């Protein structure tokens, strides 16, 4: 038997609002949603991610099943390689700058093109003093180190959209023996940037280091035959796990399953994820019809791909929250 695994980040609602949100769906959409569970075994609940990664359990699942590696997902070196950077035998970390959007939520800050060289010149010496090297791809900042850090932090992608009242809790979303060292390093980088680019850094509220680890080819290779997702990092994991590029892709560019060898496949539909992250249940409701349309389309493509069954995995944070 061959299985299609449909991962739906943000599809499980918190218990406190689930009844009300589901009642707000149209009768037709609620019927379509209910039909997904008809004839299936009772759902099982599995905890896959540590508290620092609880907002992206689908990534924790992909990391474990594709790479056969335990622990927190390693993001930064694979994001670097997804941007066509070379594999380096060093520990990679992402350096992100954050600001607040007009609603007060945490948002990514990016330097303008003409400010990037000056920002790099300001940050690089500070990192070098700590035995690290600045790496830039596009507008993304990374740092590489041979020594490694005893440090873990919530992935920056999971912070974006955080409500203003929760931003004060940022210090609690990082851990490890090197936490103070990292905080001091980020403070010095921020100071150097503000000195070199006083006007361009006015909107920066802080810096964040996350996603660290080393990339390594997976052996034995994954038994999954194809992965379709809009997550470039997950696609890099899949490629490192031995799945050929021809059998990988994004949903926007694929309308049918790749002509891969017979075997299990993974497809991630993330239409609800951003709304779920923001607890924007009106947006969640509006996006549900599109998710159901996509899911029905791909289920209809299973037979030509020699898939005999499917598993629907609906992801959530803590179901009690």
Regions found by a protein language model. Name each.
Residues 135-142, 208-210, 302-309:
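Acidic carboxylate-rich catalytic motifs and surrounding loops in phosphoryl-/glycosyl-chemistry enzymes
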Residues 150-281:
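A contiguous, surface-oriented mixed alpha/beta subdomain in the mid-to-C-terminal portion of proteins
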Residues 8-10, 95-101, 266-274:
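Short loop/turn segments at strand-loop or loop-helix junctions that form parts
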Residues 1-18:
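N-terminal basic/disordered segments at the start of proteins
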Residues 73, 78-186:
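A contiguous, mid-domain pocket- or channel-lining segment that forms the substrate-recognition surface
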Residues 25-26, 113-124, 182-189, 281-295:
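Well-ordered, non-membrane alpha-helical segments in soluble/globular domains
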Residues 257-266, 270-321:
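C-terminal regions of proteins
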Residues 18-117:
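An N-terminal, globular interaction/scaffold subdomain
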């Amino acid at each position: 038997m061959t299985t299609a695994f449909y991962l739906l980040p943000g599809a499980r609602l918190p218990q406190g609002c689930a009844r009300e949100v589901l009642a707000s769906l149209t009768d037709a959409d609620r019927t379509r949603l209910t039909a997904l569970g008809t004839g299936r075994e009772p759902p099982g609940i599995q905890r896959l991610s540590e508290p620092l990664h609880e907002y992206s359990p689908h990534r924790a699942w992909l990391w474990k099943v594709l790479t056969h590696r335990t622990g927190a997902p390693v993001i930064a070196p694979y994001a670097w390689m997804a941007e066509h950077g070379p594999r380096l035998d060093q520990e990679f970390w992402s350096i992100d700058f954050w600001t607040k959007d007009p609603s007060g939520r945490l948002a990514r800050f990016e330097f303008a093109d003409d400010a990037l060289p000056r920002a790099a010149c300001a940050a690089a010496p500070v990192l070098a003093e700590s035995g690290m090297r600045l790496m830039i791809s596009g507008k993304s900042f990374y740092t590489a180190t041979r020594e490694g850090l005893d440090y873990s932090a919530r992935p920056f992608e999971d912070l974006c959209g955080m409500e203003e009242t929760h931003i004060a809790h940022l210090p609690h979303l990082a851990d490890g023996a090197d936490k103070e060292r990292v905080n001091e390093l980020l403070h010095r980088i921020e100071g150097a940037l503000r000195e070199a680019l006083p006007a361009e850094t006015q909107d920066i509220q802080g810096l964040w280091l996350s996603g660290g680890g080393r990339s390594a080819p997976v052996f034995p290779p994954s038994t999954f035959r194809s992965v379709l997702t809009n997550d470039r990092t997950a696609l890099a994991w899949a490629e490192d796990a031995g799945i050929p590029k021809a059998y990988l892709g994004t949903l926007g560019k694929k309308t049918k399953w790749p002509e891969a060898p017979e075997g299990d496949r993974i497809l991630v539909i993330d239409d609800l994820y951003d709304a779920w992250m923001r607890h924007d249940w009106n947006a969640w409701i509006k996006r549900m019809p599109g998710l159901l349309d996509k899911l029905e389309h791909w289920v209809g493509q299973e037979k030509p791909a020699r898939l005999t069954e499917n598993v629907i995995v609906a992801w959530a944070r803590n179901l009690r929250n």
